[in-house]
Structures are given as C-alpha cells and as structure tokens.
Design a protein with these regions (language model features):
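C-terminal all-alpha effector/ligand-binding and dimerization domain
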Residues: 197, 201-217
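Helix-turn-helix
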Residues: 19, 23, 27-61, 65
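N-terminal intrinsically disordered/low-complexity leader segments
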Residues: 1-15, 185-195, 224
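Hydrophobic alpha-helical connector segments
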Residues: 75-121, 137-140, 144-147
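Short, basic, alpha-helical segments at the C-terminal edge of helix-turn-helix-like DNA-binding modules
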Residues: 69-73
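Hydrophobic alpha-helical bundle segments that form small-molecule/ligand-binding pockets
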Residues: 122-144, 148-150, 154-176, 190, ...
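Amphipathic alpha-helical segments used for helix-helix packing
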Residues: 67, 95-115, 125, 156-160, ...
Length: 224
C-alpha cells in the first residue's frame, strides 16, 4: 500500500532584528517614511505586528535603527597622502546614501534623537581625517560643519526636483511657455540651465564640494 507523501512545510526565514530593519528600509525607500507602520511592516514580513515589538519596543526605536543602518552604509575616510581625495570620497558617498534613502534626511533634521552610533562613528572619522591633515581643532570644527551642511543641504534641495521631474517631466517646458523673459532674462537663462541637466546629475554637488575643499586647503596651507 503506497504511503501518501506529506506536504512539504514552507520554510520561512527566521525573524531577526536585521531582517526587520531591512524590510523597514525597503518600505520607506519605496513609499516614504509616512508609509511605514508596524502593521504594514508586519504584513510585508508575513508575521503578526506584535512580534515586531520583541525587537523594537516603539516605532521610534525602529526608525532610530533604520537611521543607524543608513549611516552604516556611508564610506569612512581612508588615510592616503591626499586628504582632499579622502574627504571627497566620503562626502560623495554620504550624499549618494541619503539620496538612495530619501526619507532619512527628514529624520536627521527633526532633532528628536541623539545621533545614532553609526553616525557618531562617521562624524568622528571625518573629524579625525581633518585633524590628521593638519587642521586645528577650531578649523576642523568649521570645516566639518561646512561639509555636513553642503551634503544635507544639497540632498534637501535636490529631492523635490527629482520627485517633480519624475511625476511631471514636462513641467519646466510648460512653465517656460508663459515665462516673462524680457522682465527676468537672467532667471530664464538659469532655468534653462536646470532644464538641460539630467535627472540625478550631481555636478552641482561636486562643484560646491570642490569650492569648499579649495577654500579649506588654502586655510590649511596658510596656517602651516
């Protein structure tokens, strides 16, 4: 008599803190931080919402963990003879990470929590690279904030443009149809320059970054 084969049980990936964080980041990347809820996250993971609270007692704890994971993606500075190249790579890496996770900048700027461990490590590494390049403590302080403001400021400035260009690719053309060229010729020229840029073009970021690095190098050299 043939024995009936038992149906194979579905093998689920065990729930873990790392798995919850990855799923939460993917959800926020896709729909923004506003789309994140414990209920929706549990649904995506195929678990009960209450099981998430074993890893994160509050939603704020979850978003703190997400921010920590995001800052952990940022490149730390090397220690080559070229301090500018080392800092440049880190700044570009930080910008790319924040653009990849557009929701993160909102959380960084809300002032709700102390910076995460990964962010503190990144800050310490940048400060240390500036000090090892010969900057005084005071100049390192100002240099770090100039770089940080440029990174975060650029991301905050460019994200709405990326969203608009994706949702309404012909918006600039329609805007320029009725633009008062005679009254505002310089602004019209400026808008045309923007219109010619490719979505996601980062030359603006790198232009400003080079100005900052050039200025810092002059200050460093004059203080030597």
């Amino acid at each position: 008599m043939a024995t009936q084969a038992r149906p194979k049980r579905e093998i689920r990936t065990p729930l873990s803190r790392e798995r919850v964080l990855r799923a939460a980041i993917e959800l926020a990347d896709e729909g923004g931080i506003e789309s994140l809820s414990m209920r929706r996250l549990a649904q995506d993971l195929g678990v009960e919402a209450m099981s998430l609270y074993y890893y994160f007692a509050r939603k704020d704890d979850l978003t703190d963990g997400m921010l920590d994971a995001v800052f952990g993606e940022m490149e730390l500075p090397a220690s080559t003879p070229d301090w500018r190249a080392d800092v440049r790579r880190c700044a570009i890496s930080a910008k790319e990470v924040l653009l990849r996770h557009a929701w993160a900048t909102k959380l960084v700027g809300n002032g709700r929590t102390f910076p995460s461990q990964a962010r503190l490590v990144w800050m310490n590494a940048i400060l240390g690279r500036l000090r090892s390049a010969g900057f005084s403590p005071n100049m390192t302080h100002h240099a770090y904030h100039a770089l940080d403001s440029h990174i975060v400021g650029f991301v905050l400035w460019v994200l709405p443009y990326l969203a608009i260009s994706k949702a309404q690719p012909d918006l600039t053309a329609r805007f320029l149809e009725d633009f008062p060229y005679a009254e505002l010729p310089h602004l019209a020229e400026h808008i045309r320059e923007h219109a010619e840029e490719r979505p996601g073009d980062t030359s603006e970021f790198e232009f400003g970054l080079e100005l900052i690095l050039d200025g810092l190098e002059r200050l460093r050299a004059s203080a030597a």
